[in-house]
């Protein structure tokens, strides 16, 4: 049974597989550090306050920072957490537990640099980053898991929730669901384990790192075939020539085209701008929250029409 669950975690990236078929509304939430956690929470809560029933999503896909928000939304706790984030934004030190330690050791910096510089998602590239993540002198895995558990406080796995991660040794994409036999906190911690910053997390017999080490920051193929999808990506409005962190130039646009070609009407949204160097800075959470709510006000009518 354990071997079956271990093997079932691996799911190749494929839009043709139409993983989202049978679902009416898919919410796809990408990575982007603490900053994007706050932005997404404020944006989605802002949409809800303006009449868009975001929590009606029957498929919620979360990657990296998005796995935390996906857990919150699928558990029906968005409104409550939005109030907490707004409060915590005024006390940045309380958010520090999720931002990693300060100065990096050389072994950590090596993994961070490899991930940041990667412009493709070839298996050898991903495995090279994974091996560096395993070798990095990071805090023990349970430290992040406990911090995530304290923030989420979710014991029962929400049926709609799917989180992503990457096997550090094989480079395979891993998808954790209600059938995987893994806690929400462990799954979200694995999805958020940035190479060199946090230790890879145990998912059954695998050691898993950030779901973004895969050529995609959203894994929107998991929504392919759904009735409609709302995709939140940190780089939604960034130049298509941008590359790094295993994504190639134009990959975001190709992914959106493939999702739509699968028969899923998709809307892509994200911040107008962001500071890549400040994504893990707790002091920037308040500004991210304000930006997310402001964008929700701009987008509410269009998203409501799309969401149905």
Regions found by a protein language model. Give the residues of each.
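Gly/Ala-rich beta-loop-alpha elbow adjacent to hydrolase catalytic centers
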Residues: 62, 66
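Patatin-like phospholipase
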Residues: 1-61, 71-308
């Amino acid at each position: 049974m354990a071997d079956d669950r271990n093997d079932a975690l691996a799911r190749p990236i494929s839009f043709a597989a139409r993983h989202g078929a049978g679902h009416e509304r898919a919410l796809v939430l990408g990575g982007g550090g603490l900053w994007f956690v706050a932005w997404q929470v404020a944006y989605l809560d802002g949409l809800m306050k303006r009449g868009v029933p975001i929590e009606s999503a029957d498929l919620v896909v979360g990657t990296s920072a998005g796995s935390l928000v996906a857990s919150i939304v699928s558990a029906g706790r968005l409104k409550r957490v939005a109030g907490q984030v707004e409060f915590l934004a005024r006390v940045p030190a309380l958010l520090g537990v999720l931002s990693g330690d300060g100065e990096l050791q050389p072994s950590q910096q090596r993994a961070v640099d490899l991930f940041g510089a990667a412009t493709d998602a070839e298996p050898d590239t991903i495995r090279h980053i994974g091996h560096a993540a395993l070798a990095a002198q990071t805090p023990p895995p349970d430290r992040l898991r406990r911090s995530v558990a304290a923030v989420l406080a979710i014991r029962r796995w929400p049926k709609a929730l799917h989180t992503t991660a990457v096997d550090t040794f094989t480079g395979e994409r891993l998808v954790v669901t209600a059938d995987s036999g893994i806690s929400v906190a462990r799954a979200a911690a694995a999805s958020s384990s940035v190479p060199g910053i946090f230790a890879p997390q145990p998912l059954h017999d695998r050691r898993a790192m950030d779901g973004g080490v895969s050529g995609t920051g959203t894994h929107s193929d998991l929504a392919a075939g759904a009735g409609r999808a709302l995709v939140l990506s940190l780089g939604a409005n960034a130049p298509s020539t941008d590359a790094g962190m295993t994504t190639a130039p134009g990959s975001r646009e190709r992914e959106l085209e493939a999702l739509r070609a699968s028969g899923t009407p998709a809307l892509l949204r994200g911040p107008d701008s962001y500071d890549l160097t400040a994504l893990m800075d707790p002091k920037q959470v308040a500004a991210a929250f304000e930006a997310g709510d402001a964008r929700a006000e701009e987008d509410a009518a269009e998203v409501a029409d799309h969401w149905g």
